[in-house]
Curated annotation (Swiss-Prot):
The gene is SKN7. It is found in: Nucleus. Phosphorylated by the phosphorelay intermediate protein YPD1. InterPro entries: CheY-like_superfamily, HSF_DNA-bd, Sig_transdc_resp-reg_receiver, Sig_transdc_resp-reg_Skn7, WH-like_DNA-bd_sf, WH_DNA-bd_sf. This is Transcription factor SKN7. Residues 342-365 have a biased composition (Pro residues).
Length: 559
C-alpha cells in the first residue's frame, strides 16, 4: 500500500492538526503535500527547483490518473478552483521566460506563501477562505458605488462633449458628400466638353484635308490646261492620310466624293459639330469663280492674274525652286510601294506640246521622309506619305513644289515601309525615333509592311482611311494621347487589334487602357521576342501559334 493510501499516524503533526481543526480543515492541502513529497508522479506533478511552488507538467495525465484517486475531482478546472479556495495562485510566466521555462509551455505552476517543500509545519497556516470574503466583496462594491456617484457628473460632462463632437463630425461628413456630388457634376461637364473638343479637332483636321486636296486638284487642273501660274505661297496640309492621293486625283472633288469624317461614327455629335462635318468644299470649275481671289492677289502682288490663289504660307515657291527640288528627287524605287486600300492609280501623263509642256503625274507617294535610322535591310523600302509635304507639281510648267523644310516637325509625318509580298500591314503610332527605328526593323524582319505615324490625330485619320491588321499605339504623344485616340477609333473600328506600348503598367493604368478599347499591353522596354509574341497572338491562327514558339522559326511563318 502506498503512502498516500495509508492513514496518517495519530502521533504525527499532520494527523493532530487535522483532528484539532475541524472547521478550518486543510486535508486537501495535506494530501497535496504528501503526494508531492513522493516521487511516484514526478513526470506529471512535482516541486519546482526552488521548492516554493509546485507545477503540473502534464494536465491530461494529472486529470486522468491522479485527480480521481486522491482528490475526487472530475476535471482539472475544479482542482484549480479548489486551490483558489486555499489562496493558491497560478504563477504567470512571461513570453520571454517561456523560451527557457524548463517544464514546457503547457505546464501549470501554483504557489502559496506557506506551501514549501519539507515544511509540513507551515501547512497549519494555510486555511480555507471563509464567508468573510463575501462581506468584504460587498464592502468593496459599496465603496465602488460611492466612488461612481462622485464621478458621475464628470462622466456626464464627457458624454455630452462626445455627443457634440459626433454631431460636428456628422455635419462635416454631409458637407463632404455635397462637395463630392458637386465635383462629380463638374467632372461630368468637363468630360463632355473634352469629348466635344476632340470631336471638333478631328472634324477640323478632316475639313482641312479636304480643303487642301481640292486646292491641289484645282492647281493641277489649271497647270495641265496650259495656264501659267505665278509663284504662290501654298501651305502644306496639317494632316493627310496615307491614301490621300494628293497629285493623283486630277479632277475636282465634289460633295459626293468628299471624305467621310471620323466624327460621323461618334455616338452623340453636337449640332454645331454636325454642321461643320457636313460642310464640303465646292469645286472650282472655271477661272471665273476665282475672280475675287485674283483681285486680292493683284492688289498684293501688283500683277494681272487670272487664276485662284491658295492660302498664304511661310515658304514662297518659284520656278528656280521647282527646278532644283525636282532635280534632287530620287529615281523611282525598284520594288513597288505598298499602297493603302482604295487608292486610285495615277493617271497617265498627258501628251507634251512644244510651247507649253504638261507636267508628268506625281507618284502615288507624295514625298519621301524618313526618320533617321540605321541602314535598312536590302528588302526594306521606306516611302513616306508625309502629311507635312505637298507633292511636286510639274518641274517645267512653273508648278508648285513644297519642301520638307516648310514643316520641320516630325509630329505630323506619316511614313510607310514596305516589303515584297507582305503578309500583314501594321500601323506603328510612336513619336520616339529610337523606338520607331527598332520596331520598324523587327516588323520588317518578320515580314510586315509598316506605316508609321507620330501623333494620335494622324493615327485616327490613317485608321479611318486604311485597313490594318494590327496597330501598335504609344500612350504619351503630341496633339492627342494614345488612349483617347483608341477610344475614338473604337467608335468606327471595333475589330482591329490595338496594342498599347507604354512603360506605365500600374493596375490603374492597365484598366484605363483596356477601358478605352485597347486589345493588349506591350510593356516598355520590350524585346523582339515580346514583340513577336504580340504579333503571333493577334495575327497568327491558333494552330500556327501552337506549333512553334521560337521567334526564329515563327519569323518564317510571318514572312
Amino acid at each position: 500500500m502506498s503512502s498516500l493510501q495509508q492513514p496518517i499516524p495519530p502521533n504525527s503533526t499532520l494527523a493532530t492538526t487535522a483532528s484539532s481543526n475541524q472547521s478550518g480543515s486543510n486535508d486537501f492541502v495535506k494530501k497535496l503535500f504528501l503526494m508531492l513529497q513522493e516521487d511516484s508522479y514526478k513526470e506529471v506533478v512535482r516541486w519546482t527547483v526552488k521548492g516554493d511552488s509546485f507545477v503540473v507538467i502534464n494536465t491530461n495525465e494529472f486529470t486522468k490518473d491522479i485527480l480521481p484517486k486522491h482528490f475526487k475531482h472530475s476535471n482539472f478546472a475544479s482542482f484549480v478552483r479548489q486551490l483558489n479556495k486555499y489562496d493558491f495562485h497560478k504563477v504567470k510566466i512571461s513570453n520571454e521566460a517561456k523560451a527557457s521555462y524548463p517544464y514546457g509551455e503547457d505546464a501549470w505552476e501554483f504557489k502559496h506563501p506557506e506551501f514549501r517543500i519539507n515544511d509540513a509545519e507551515a501547512l497549519e497556516n494555510i486555511k480555507r477562505k471563509g464567508p468573510t470574503a463575501k462581506k468584504s466583496a460587498s464592502n468593496v462594491t459599496i465603496k465602488t458605488e460611492a466612488n461612481n456617484n462622485g464621478t458621475q457628473p464628470t462622466c456626464n460632462h464627457n458624454y455630452s462633449q462626445l455627443v457634440s463632437a459626433t454631431n460636428h463630425l456628422k455635419e462635416q461628413v454631409e458637407s463632404l458628400k455635397n462637395d463630392k456630388h458637386s465635383l462629380y457634376q463638374e467632372i461630368s461637364v468637363l468630360e463632355r466638353k473634352y469629348k466635344t473638343v476632340v470631336e471638333n479637332i478631328v472634324a477640323i483636321n478632316t475639313f482641312n484635308e479636304r480643303y487642301y486636296r481640292s486646292m491641289n486638284v484645282l492647281i493641277n487642273s489649271i497647270v495641265q490646261n496650259g495656264m501659267k501660274l505665278p509663284p504662290l505661297d501654298f501651305p502644306p496640309p496639317v494632316q493627310l492620310g496615307p491614301d490621300s492621293g494628293i497629285g493623283s486625283n486630277l479632277g475636282p472633288i465634289s460633295s459626293d466624293t468628299a471624305l467621310p469624317s471620323i466624327s460621323h461614327h461618334l455616338s452623340s455629335p453636337l449640332p454645331h459639330h454636325q454642321q461643320l462635318l457636313n460642310r464640303t468644299i465646292r469645286p472650282i470649275s472655271s477661272p471665273i469663280d476665282g475672280i475675287p481671289l485674283v483681285k486680292l492677289q493683284q492688289q498684293s502682288l501688283g500683277q494681272n492674274l487670272q487664276a485662284p490663289i491658295g492660302t498664304p504660307s511661310a515658304v514662297p515657291f518659284s520656278e528656280e525652286a521647282s527646278s532644283s527640288i525636282q532635280a534632287a528627287t530620287p529615281a523611282p524605287l525598284a520594288q513597288p510601294v505598298a499602297q493603302p486600300i482604295n487608292q486610285p492609280p495615277p493617271p497617265p501623263p498627258p501628251p507634251a506640246t512644244q510651247q507649253q509642256p504638261l507636267p508628268p503625274p506625281p507618284p502615288p507617294a507624295t514625298a519621301t521622309s524618313q526618320i533617321p535610322s540605321a541602314p535598312p535591310p536590302p528588302t526594306q523600302q521606306q516611302v513616306g506619305t508625309s502629311s507635312s509635304s505637298v507633292p511636286t507639281i510639274s518641274p517645267k510648267s512653273q508648278g508648285i513644289v513644297v519642301s520638307n523644310s516648310a514643316s520641320p516637325t516630325t509630329s505630323a509625318q506619316i511614313s510607310t515601309t514596305s516589303v515584297p509580298n507582305p503578309k500583314f500591314h501594321v500601323l506603328l503610332v510612336e513619336d520616339d525615333n529610337v523606338c520607331i527605328q527598332l520596331c520598324r526593323k523587327f516588323l520588317v524582319k518578320y515580314g510586315c509592311s509598316v506605316t508609321v505615324v507620330t501623333d494620335g490625330l494622324n493615327a485616327i485619320s490613317t485608321v479611318e482611311h486604311t485597313k490594318y491588321d494590327l496597330v501598335l499605339m504609344d500612350i504619351v504623344m503630341p496633339n492627342l494621347d494614345g488612349a483617347t485616340a483608341t477610344s475614338v477609333i473604337r467608335s468606327f473600328d471595333t475589330k482591329t487589334p490595338i496594342i498599347a506600348m507604354t512603360g506605365n503598367i500600374e493596375d490603374n493604368d492597365l484598366v484605363t487602357y483596356l477601358q478605352n478599347g485597347m486589345s493588349d499591353i506591350l510593356a516598355k522596354p520590350f524585346t523582339k521576342d515580346d514583340l513577336y509574341a504580340i504579333l503571333s497572338k493577334h495575327l497568327l491562327d491558333p494552330k500556327e501559334n501552337k506549333q512553334d514558339n521560337e521567334p526564329t522559326v515563327k519569323k518564317q511563318k510571318l514572312s
